[in-house]
């Protein structure tokens, strides 16, 4: 019997070796127990024992779960949890049922108080040496022993029939199992697991959300953010300033809750399920989701959980604070993100699509960041492209007009060579200069002595901007460089000029165009597309035909007054170009009163009751006007005009169309050819006045029609200029208007031109208008006729009416000068085509 028992112990040890367990201390104890058992059997052989009917015996147990703790060879398991263990012995069969009791007894003794149900084996070895059971131990019992019996066969492995009595298998340590209860209840463990998972998510989110916001960004938000952002940043900034301490506290707290979560979850479950569930829970709910949320809303979440963060920092301070101090010493103080000039410019550029910056604001920021990199040589105007004046120039009307047309307010003045800049002329210096005095520019420059400032071409724009901003050197500087070319000594050479406007243009990355600029860009010479101002230099022209010459200023004033104040000379009747050319004719006169009596006829400009055919505008001096039979008298001064009735009828004149109005032309021809004033105008001081005769006025109107024809493309510019010059210069004060006379062939040409229109196809070739109304009606019907035919008809009609006007005063000889522009061959060929 002893040998039989020891063989079973050897089988148990061998089974442990098969399962990968070496003959350790527990196996040694098992052998020692077997020897003790053999000795006890020999000593008790003389005792009386009852006969055991059963042929099986259990000599040892082993739990299949490797994680179960073993103390002194006795396994310790958790209550109320399914446990699988293997029993070793002999004669084990499928109907060998076991149970557990808390009472000690010898082998073969009765098992009167079983503590668990009967359990049948899940599987049994073929030789009957081992069997596998699944058992759940109840609570409130600390130590269990095995009882067994041969039960009736049943399919339920957890419960067996109870009719056969149970036999105690002994109180050996190899047959003993201890239990323990969990430290906390299951429901409390579940709550703690969920709480740990929540804190794990919070710590993971704060780790990314808070640590991704550097100190510089928080300062920006505290100063420039919205009200909420300022509030949140103010709460976070004190904690974020302790970067390493915050990092260590968050990481330590995260590791703590994750470890607790894993341990508690392992207590509730075991095996592969616990591993998979804990991994998915931590990754999905503890890492990915919170970090995704806090990466976008880290500021708000960090501010609202700041108390939790401070609490964790306080709890983990004994460990996290020393570690953070070590990191501070090793890694240095955290400064935050710092942007240099290039990074700032690139930051503005790459975020242009998502920020609210305007394009001009982006350009200004970029320009300001590049000021230190650009030099004056990059933005200066070359000296050869600058508008300058020679020191020997005279400040006459032509020079001042040239200065005004240049559009500049500061004019460099050079002496001899253009690169020898000696002074500056400001446009305000000309305020008290009379152009009639022909003041030398040198005199004016010596009086004001405006200084000039020179800089080198490698000066950066930020330095120039500061100098211009101070105002000590003005807002213009000349750029010079050292010229060491050649064999001579090096010398300073002026190569260009730079102004405050140039620097500001580089600052805002755009061209500044004010009301006086001629060019959009001085370097590219791109002209500004703007309304063309009047060229006043034309009033300084001197014509030999003029017997009396006046100053250009007075000529300009006369032009402006006539074109704006006198209806007969406004631009819709007489164009500005024609009026300017008209004033270049011999229309200026003067009267000297010295040594003449009051009744001298040469002092009278108009005599009451004496017909006149001219218009008069007083420019200088005083005149006395006597009106009506009552001889009412008053004096008048400059820019008083008389005789407008001699030019136009006293009716409202409609604005002519682009090709002229036949109604207006016919009305001009039908009025009286002379005007009889009911007043007298006598000079009482030296007087300068202009006289414009009716025939010259009609010539100017005809020239205006020609100009409108040129604008519409009927005539070329050369044809127009030649014809206007001939028209205006053909009229002199002593010349009769014979140049406007036409012979019968010219008159017939005019009538033929009218009769050839579609509206007169049914009329006879000798048809002539009998009234002005007929001409007006036909003029309305001529709107759909070809452009060239209309122009020819209108101008021919003017010539015909001029002939009627002077038919009693001139010969019938044809004028030698052509009145109509000579059309080129291409235009004639187009007209000849059907």
From Swiss-Prot:
PANTHER family: METAL TRANSPORTER CNNM, UNEXTENDED PROTEIN. One of its GO terms (cellular component) is plasma membrane. It comes from Drosophila melanogaster. It is found in: Cell membrane. Its main location: membrane. Residues 204-244, 289-298 are cytoplasmic. GO terms for biological process: cellular response to carbon dioxide; export across plasma membrane; intracellular monoatomic ion homeostasis; long-term memory; magnesium ion homeostasis; magnesium ion transmembrane transport. Glycans are attached at residues 38, 42, 156, 522, 743, 751, 790. The chain crosses the membrane at residues 183-203, 245-265, 268-288, 299-319. It is a multi-pass membrane protein. The keyword Membrane applies. GO terms for molecular function: magnesium ion transmembrane transporter activity; transmembrane transporter activity. Residues 822-834 have a biased composition (Basic and acidic residues). This is Unextended protein. Residues 739-765, 807-834 are annotated as: Disordered. Probable metal transporter. Acts downstream of PRL-1 and protects the nervous system against olfactory carbon dioxide stimulation. Disruption phenotype: RNAi-mediated knockdown in the nervous system results in a held-up wing phenotype after eclosion and upon carbon dioxide stimulation. A nucleoside 3',5'-cyclic phosphate binds at residues 604-656. Residues 380-441, 448-515 form the CBS domain. It comes from the Eukaryota. Pfam families: CNNM. Residues 182-361 form the CNNM transmembrane domain. Disulfide bonds: none annotated. Residues 1-20 form the signal peptide. Belongs to the ACDP family. InterPro entries: ACDP, CBS_dom, CBS_dom_sf, cNMP-bd_dom, cNMP-bd_dom_sf, CNNM, Ion_transp-like_CBS, RmlC-like_jellyroll.
């Amino acid at each position: 019997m002893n040998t039989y028992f020891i063989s079973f112990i050897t089988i148990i040890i061998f089974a442990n070796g098969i399962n990968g367990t070496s003959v350790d201390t527990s196996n040694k104890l098992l052998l020692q127990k077997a020897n003790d058992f053999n000795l006890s059997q020999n000593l008790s052989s003389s005792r009386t024992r009852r006969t055991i009917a059963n042929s099986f015996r259990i000599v040892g147990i082993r739990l299949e779960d490797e994680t179960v703790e073993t103390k002194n060879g006795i396994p310790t398991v958790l209550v109320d949890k399914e446990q699988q263990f293997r029993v070793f012995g002999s004669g084990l069969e499928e109907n060998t049922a076991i149970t557990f009791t808390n009472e000690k007894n010898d082998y073969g003794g009765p098992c009167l108080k079983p503590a668990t149900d009967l359990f049948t084996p899940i599987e049994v070895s073929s030789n009957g040496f081992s069997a596998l059971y699944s058992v759940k131990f109840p609570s409130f019992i600390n130590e269990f022993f095995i009882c067994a019996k041969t039960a009736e066969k049943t399919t339920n492995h957890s419960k067996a029939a109870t009719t056969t009595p149970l036999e105690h298998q002994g109180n050996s340590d190899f047959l003993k199992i201890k239990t323990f209860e969990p430290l906390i209840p299951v429901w409390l463990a579940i709550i703690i697991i969920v709480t740990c998972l929540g804190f794990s998510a919070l710590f993971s989110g704060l780790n990314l959300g808070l640590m991704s916001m550097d100190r510089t960004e928080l300062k920006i938000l505290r100063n420039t953010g919205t009200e909420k952002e300022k509030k949140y940043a103010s709460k976070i900034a004190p904690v974020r300033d302790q970067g390493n301490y915050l990092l260590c506290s968050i990481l330590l707290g995260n590791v703590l809750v994750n470890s607790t979560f894993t341990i508690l979850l392992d207590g509730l479950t075991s095996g592969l399920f616990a591993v998979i569930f804990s991994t998915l829970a931590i990754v999905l709910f503890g890492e990915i989701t919170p970090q995704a949320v806090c990466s976008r809303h880290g500021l708000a979440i960090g501010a609202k959980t700041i108390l939790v963060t401070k609490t964790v920092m306080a709890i983990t301070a004994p460990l996290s604070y020393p570690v953070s101090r070590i990191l501070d010493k090793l890694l240095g103080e955290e400064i935050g993100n710092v942007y240099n000039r290039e990074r700032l410019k690139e930051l503005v550029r790459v975020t242009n699509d998502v920020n609210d910056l305007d394009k001009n604001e982006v350009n200004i920021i970029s320009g300001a960041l590049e000021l230190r990199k650009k030099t004056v040589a990059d933005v200066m105007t070359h000296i050869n492209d600058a508008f300058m004046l020679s020191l020997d120039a005279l400040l006459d009307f032509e020079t001042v007009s040239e200065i005004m047309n240049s559009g500049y307010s500061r004019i460099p003045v050079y002496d001899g060579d253009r690169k020898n800049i000696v002074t500056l002329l400001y446009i305000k210096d000309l305020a008290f200069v009379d152009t009639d005095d022909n003041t030398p520019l040198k005199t004016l420059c010596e009086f004001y002595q405006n200084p000039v400032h020179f800089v080198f071409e490698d000066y950066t724009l930020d330095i120039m901007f500061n100098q211009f901003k101070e105002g000590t050197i003005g807002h213009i500087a000349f750029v010079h460089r050292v010229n060491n070319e050649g064999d001579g000594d090096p010398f300073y050479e002026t190569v260009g000029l730079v102004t405050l406007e140039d620097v500001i243009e580089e600052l805002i990355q755009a061209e500044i165009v004010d009301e006086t600029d001629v060019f959009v860009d001085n370097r590219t010479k791109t002209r500004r597309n703007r309304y063309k101002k009047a060229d006043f230099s034309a009033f300084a022209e001197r014509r030999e035909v003029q017997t009396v010459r006046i100053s250009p200023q007075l000529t300009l004033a006369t032009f402006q007054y006539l074109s704006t104040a006198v209806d007969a000379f406004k631009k819709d009747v007489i164009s500005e170009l024609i009026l300017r050319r008209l004033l270049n004719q011999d229309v200026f006169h003067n009267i000297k009163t010295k040594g003449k009596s009051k009744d001298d006829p040469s002092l009278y400009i108009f005599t009451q009751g004496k017909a006149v055919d001219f218009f008069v505008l007083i420019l200088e001096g005083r005149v006395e006007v006597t009106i009506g039979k009552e001889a009412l008298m008053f004096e008048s001064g400059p820019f008083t005009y008389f005789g407008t009735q001699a030019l136009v009828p006293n009716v409202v004149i409609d604005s002519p169309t682009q090709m002229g109005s036949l109604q207006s032309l016919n009305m001009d021809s039908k009025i009286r050819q002379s005007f009889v004033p009911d007043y007298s105008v006598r000079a009482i001081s030296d007087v300068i006045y202009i006289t414009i005769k009716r025939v010259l006025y009609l010539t100017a109107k005809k020239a205006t029609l020609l100009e409108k024809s040129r604008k519409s493309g009927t005539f070329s510019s050369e044809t127009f200029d030649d014809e206007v010059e001939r028209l205006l210069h053909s009229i002199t004060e002593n010349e009769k208007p014979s140049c406007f006379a036409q012979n019968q062939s010219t008159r017939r040409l005019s009538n033929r031109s009218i009769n050839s229109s579609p509206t007169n196809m049914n009329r006879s070739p000798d048809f002539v208008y009998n009234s002005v109304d007929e001409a007006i009606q036909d003029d309305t019907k001529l709107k759909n006729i070809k452009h060239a035919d209309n122009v020819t008809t209108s101008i021919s009609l003017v010539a015909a009416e001029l002939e009627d006007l002077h038919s009693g005063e001139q010969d019938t000889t044809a004028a030698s000068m052509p009145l109509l522009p000579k059309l080129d061959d291409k235009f004639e060929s187009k007209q000849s085509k059907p």
